[in-house]
Amino acid sequence: MKNRVLWCLLLLPATLMAQPARYPLTSIAGLRPINVVIETASLEGKKGLKVEASPESLASGAGGAEQLVLLEGLEFGDGVIEAEISGDIRPGAPEGARGFVGIAFRVQGDLRTYDAFYLRPTNGRADDQVRRNHSAQYISHPDWPWFRLRQEFPSKYESYVDLVPGTWTKVKIEVQGEQARLYVHGVKQPTLVVNDVKSGASARGAIALWIDKDTIAHFRNLTVTRRQ
């Protein structure tokens, strides 16, 4: 009996994680664009999904709606999200554009409420150290945009990571309750640790590719492993 109980305990961690759901992003099937234009395209010889803000979104100005690509039919609360992403500045973008690109999770039905990690690729090798320190960011819309987090909690939700615009970058997001961690470039230590995810410990929602309207983004090889 003792051996049986021990065996069940050993198996328990494995049963907590569902089988990974894989999205190569080499087609637009199963994707719902929100205020963006999507198409398959190659970057650095690798095929993926190209994402840009729609003309209507660009015309709406700085206070416009979110730019997302929703993964249809997938609900996520806790688990691991992995992908290769790339961000660069679109032609004609204003001077302050940084090529924001990332992944949103626990996206609610209003498409405005979510948590996200994103990168600012043009900050990664800037000559200004302050800009470098703002290379990776956590946000929680609509109540906690980056500028509010930076104003009220300087440096807590941002960090440095080496980035090059227009280049594939591996990212991994681990979410467990109110804790989330961002890993970049496949390293073992997280780039950014958040211990008070604003959506709360039990929130669930969709996953979406996330961009700023002044970004030309590419995504590929998205994998989602949900914790059951």
Where are these regions (language model features)?
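Bacterial N-terminal signal peptides that target proteins for export
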Residues: 1-7
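Extracellular glycan-recognition regions
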Residues: 19-228
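Hydrophobic h-region of N-terminal signal peptides that target proteins for export
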Residues: 10-18
